[in-house]
Amino acid sequence: MAVTVIGAGLAGCEAAFAAAQRGQDVDLWEMKPQRYTPAHHSPLFAELVCSNSLKAQRVESAAGLLKEEMARLGSLCVPIARRTSVLCHDRQHHFGARICGAR
C-alpha cells in the first residue's frame, strides 16, 4: 500500500521523500500545473511563494533550528536550499528545478 501525500510544497516534498527513503511506495498529488493559486508562478514542486519562505539560518532562531534538525535527519529541501542559496523569492525557479530533479 502506497503512502499518499497531498501537495508538493516544502512539507509535501519532505514527507514524500522521507517515506520513499524508508522503502515506502509514494503517490504524490499536486494541483499544478493544472491549477494555480494567485501566489504560484511555476509548475515545479516546492515553489517558494513568499520572500521569507525559509526564514533565518541562525540555529538560535526557531526557523534556523528547525532547518538544522531537518538537515541532520536527511532533509531533501534544506541541503538544496543551502546549495542554491535560496534565502529570498526564487523568481528563476532554481530551487524547484533542483527539487524536481533530486535523486
Report the location of each language-model feature.
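Beta1/beta-strand and adjacent pyrophosphate-binding region of the FAD-binding site
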Residues: M1-A11
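A short, structure-level motif marking secondary-structure boundaries and short turns
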Residues: M1-A2, S51-S53, T84-C88
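N-terminal FAD cofactor-binding segment of flavoenzymes
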Residues: A11, F17-I80
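Residue-level marker for well-ordered alpha-helical positions
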Residues: C13, G64, A97-G101
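Feature captures the FAD/FMN-dependent oxidoreductase FAD-binding
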Residues: E69-R103
